[in-house]
Swiss-Prot record:
PROSITE patterns: NUDIX, NUDIX_BOX. It comes from Mycobacterium tuberculosis (strain ATCC 25618 / H37Rv). Gene3D superfamilies: Nucleoside Triphosphate Pyrophosphohydrolase (3.90.79.10). One of its GO terms (molecular function) is 8-oxo-7,8-dihydroguanosine triphosphate pyrophosphatase activity. This is Putative 8-oxo-dGTP diphosphatase 2. Belongs to the Nudix hydrolase family. The gene is mutT2. A motif (Nudix box) lies at residues 37-58. InterPro entries: MutT-like, Nudix_hydrolase, NUDIX_hydrolase-like_dom_sf, NUDIX_hydrolase_CS, NUDIX_hydrolase_dom. The lineage of its organism: Bacteria, Bacillati, Actinomycetota, Actinomycetes, Mycobacteriales. Its cofactor is Mg(2+); Mn(2+). It holds the Pfam family NUDIX. Keywords: DNA damage, DNA repair, DNA replication, Hydrolase, Magnesium, Manganese, Metal-binding, Mutator protein. Signal peptide: none annotated. Disruption phenotype: No visible phenotype. CDD domains: NUDIX_MutT_NudA_like.
Length: 141
C-alpha cells in the first residue's frame, strides 16, 4: 500500500508562526494546527503545500515560497505521514477559509496552544525556527 504524504506549512512572520484552528472532524474541532493538506498523485510536496495553503488561506500560490523541512516526519497511522516545511509569505494576508480562526504565535506561546496531537511533535522545532528568525532580524522574540 502506498504511503500518503500530508504536508503542513510553518508560515513565519518575524518572530511568529501562523496556526489555524480546525473546524472538523469533531474530535479535533477547536484545536490548532499548522495549515496544509494531502499531496496529490504526480504533485511534489512543495507544490502541494503551496496549493493547499493558497486554497485554505485565500492566497495566491505566487504569494508563497516553500523552504526547508521543519522537524521530523510524524506517522499519523500505518499509511499516512505528516511533514512540515517552513514557508515564506511573499504577499497577501492569510484569511481563515477552511478554519475557524488564524493566529500568529510566538515561541513563548507555542506550549500554550491546544494543538492537534500530531503537530505537538514539532513544538521544539518551531521554537528553534522562531528563535532563529529572531537572530536573523537582530531582535529578541
Amino acid at each position: 500500500m502506498l504511503n500518503q504524504i500530508v504536508v503542513a506549512g510553518a508560515i513565519v512572520r518575524g518572530c511568529t508562526v501562523l496556526v489555524a484552528q480546525r473546524v472538523r472532524p469533531p474530535e479535533l474541532a477547536g484545536r490548532w494546527e499548522l495549515p496544509g493538506g494531502k499531496v496529490a498523485a504526480g504533485e511534489t510536496e512543495r507544490a502541494a503545500l503551496a496549493r493547499e495553503l493558497a486554497e485554505e488561506l485565500g492566497l495566491e500560490v505566487a504569494d508563497l515560497a516553500v523552504g526547508d523541512r521543519v522537524g521530523d516526519d510524524i506517522a499519523l497511522n500505518g499509511t499516512t505521514t505528516l511533514r512540515a516545511y517552513r514557508v515564506h509569505l511573499l504577499g497577501g494576508e492569510p484569511r481563515a477559509r477552511d478554519h475557524r480562526a488564524l493566529c500568529w504565535v510566538t515561541a513563548a506561546e507555542l506550549h500554550d496552544v491546544d494543538w492537534v496531537p500530531a503537530d505537538r511533535g514539532w513544538i521544539a522545532d518551531l521554537a528553534r525556527t522562531l528563535n532563529g528568525s529572531a537572530a536573523d532580524v537582530h531582535r529578541r522574540c
